[in-house]
Structures are given as structure tokens and as C-alpha cells.
């Protein structure tokens, strides 16, 4: 292969939520509560803003993110990017549309772990980013639906939307929580990081086709690695291919330029930071 240029820097945004992320929805509508006609109207506006801003800011790739599901990625992929007529309707400007069609999108599933870490016992958000080579059906059936969560008195259920809704309904009946069944269920559902790793590693479809990462707000260079949560933290960070952080001290800790061998021994690899 011949190449006439060296490295190319491209701007990627790995973590863009859609309106289906009802745990963190700042878009003014809930897709699960609208008719299909109203949802199409509202989602058209979301897609227009998403891709127009991406082009304006020269973003080359976007990680379409939702909690415990693929609904946003699925809708964007199937009803927009795979539909020339829909793309023409939303983006009549030919030049803009061509630029949008060159943007690389990939699914980012945000999960909440059942583990708590840190002085304040914070829950851990855990991202599994898949290659867009993996089909939506494979991710749903062979990854999401293979995970389980605690439902009631030691009973577990598969991680499906219908089961999450049932969990929410049960919690509302017992505790008078407000919100839709799905919202309440999503607020309470958690999964196990060892189970995630097992499902990914045991299915050859996913081999070398995913990245694991966690967002890190705190300064990892200052935390106590002798605490009770050491084993949990170590195992989670060891699974990660990279970290989502802008904390300069954490970045320095993760890159470990002054203790590379020790970092690799303890955490499996040097951790690039996004």
C-alpha cells in the first residue's frame, strides 16, 4: 500500500446521547410516550441538529449512546442513514448531505454496574462501544439479552426492555415511585461487569469488535488503592481499553510514562484517555 501523507487527526465524539436516553434526556420529548407520527417529527429535528452541528464542528465520527439499549442508534441507522429519501427530506442541501453521509457512526451502550466505588459509594457507568460491523440484531440478541439483572429475591431476568418495564412496574407497586415503568426500571437496573466480559469473550462475533471504557471524573492519582473497593476498581479498569476523562492528573496517571511496567502489570495495559 502506498500513502502520500503521514498521520491524519480527526475529531471523534464517542459519547452522544439520543432522546431514547430517558435517564438523561434534555431534548424535550420522550420517544416512548409519542405516537409514531409525532416521534418522527420530533426525531427529525434531533437528527437535523445532530448532524448539522457535527458538520459545522468537523466531527468525523459519533458514538450514538443510550442506556441499556440500542433504540437511538437503531432509529438513526435504519430510518435515516439507510433511507436516501429520508435523508433528502431532512437535508435537501446536496453538499451538506454528502458530508453527513461520510460521518462514521457506531453504537455506544451505557450500562450501570451493580458495584459502588469511591468515598461516596458512587455507581459505575460502564460503556461498551461496538464496531458498526456488528449488526443491531447481534448486539441485541447475543449481548444485551444475554446479560441478566436482579429482579426479585434472587431471581434474575434477561436485559430486555420488556423485563426492565416489568421491574419498574413492580417497584412502583411496592414503593409508589413516580414515572413510567421503563423510567423507574432503568433507574434501578444494574448488571455485573464479570458477566459483561464473559458474554463478550464467549461469542466469536464480538472478538476484536468492541471497546470497553468508563467515565472518570476524579483524580485517580490521588485515590487510595488500599481501600475496600481496590479489587473492584482494579478489575473494572483492567477490562477498559481506554478511559473517558478530561482530568489532567488522571490522564497522566493512566498514561503512566514514569511507571509503564508497573501499570501494565497491575491494570493490564496503558490506558489512552478520550
Please identify what each model-predicted range represents:
Residues 274:
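Eukaryote-biased recognition of electropositive, low-complexity segments
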Residues 39-47, 68-72, 188-192:
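Phosphate/oxyanion-binding active-site loops and adjacent basic polyanion-contact surfaces
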Residues 226-269:
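Extended hydrophobic/aromatic segments used for targeting, binding, or gating
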Residues 18-43:
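Acidic/histidine-rich helix-loop elements
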Residues 11-21, 67:
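Histidine-centered catalytic micro-motifs
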Residues 1-4, 27-29, 75-244:
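Extended substrate/RNA-proximal surfaces in nucleic-acid metabolism proteins
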Residues 51-70:
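Divalent metal-dependent hydrolysis catalytic cores, especially in the metallo-beta-lactamase
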Residues 47-57, 201-204, 260-265:
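Short, basic/hydrophobic alpha-helical segments
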Amino acid at each position: 500500500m502506498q500513502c502520500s501523507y503521514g498521520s491524519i487527526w480527526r475529531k471523534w465524539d464517542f459519547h452522544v446521547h439520543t432522546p431514547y436516553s430517558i435517564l438523561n434526556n434534555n431534548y424535550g420529548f420522550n420517544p416512548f410516550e409519542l405516537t409514531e407520527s409525532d416521534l418522527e417529527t420530533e426525531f427529525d429535528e434531533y437528527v437535523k441538529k445532530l448532524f448539522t452541528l457535527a458538520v459545522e464542528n468537523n466531527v468525523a465520527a459519533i458514538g450514538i449512546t443510550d442506556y441499556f439499549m440500542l433504540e437511538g442508534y437503531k432509529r438513526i441507522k435504519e430510518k435515516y442513514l439507510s433511507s436516501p429519501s429520508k435523508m433528502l427530506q431532512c437535508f435537501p442541501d446536496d453538499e451538506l448531505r454528502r458530508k453527513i453521509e461520510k460521518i462514521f457512526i457506531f453504537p455506544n451502550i451505557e450500562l450501570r454496574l451493580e458495584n459502588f466505588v469511591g468515598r461516596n459509594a458512587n455507581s459505575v457507568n460502564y460503556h461498551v462501544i461496538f464496531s458498526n460491523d456488528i449488526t443491531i440484531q447481534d448486539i441485541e440478541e447475543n449481548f444485551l439479552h444475554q446479560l441478566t439483572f436482579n429482579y426479585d429475591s434472587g431471581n434474575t431476568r434477561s436485559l430486555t426492555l420488556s423485563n426492565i418495564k416489568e421491574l419498574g412496574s413492580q417497584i412502583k407497586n411496592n414503593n409508589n415511585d413516580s414515572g413510567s415503568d421503563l423510567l423507574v426500571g432503568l433507574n434501578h437496573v444494574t448488571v455485573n461487569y464479570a458477566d459483561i466480559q464473559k458474554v463478550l469473550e464467549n461469542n466469536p462475533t464480538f472478538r476484536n469488535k468492541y471497546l470497553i471504557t468508563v467515565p472518570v471524573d476524579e483524580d485517580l492519582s490521588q485515590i487510595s488503592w488500599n481501600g475496600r473497593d481496590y479489587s473492584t476498581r482494579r478489575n473494572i479498569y483492567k477490562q477498559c481499553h481506554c478511559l473517558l476523562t478530561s482530568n489532567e492528573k488522571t490522564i497522566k496517571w493512566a498514561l503512566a510514562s514514569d511507571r509503564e511496567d508497573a501499570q501494565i502489570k497491575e491494570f493490564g495495559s496503558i490506558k489512552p484517555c478520550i
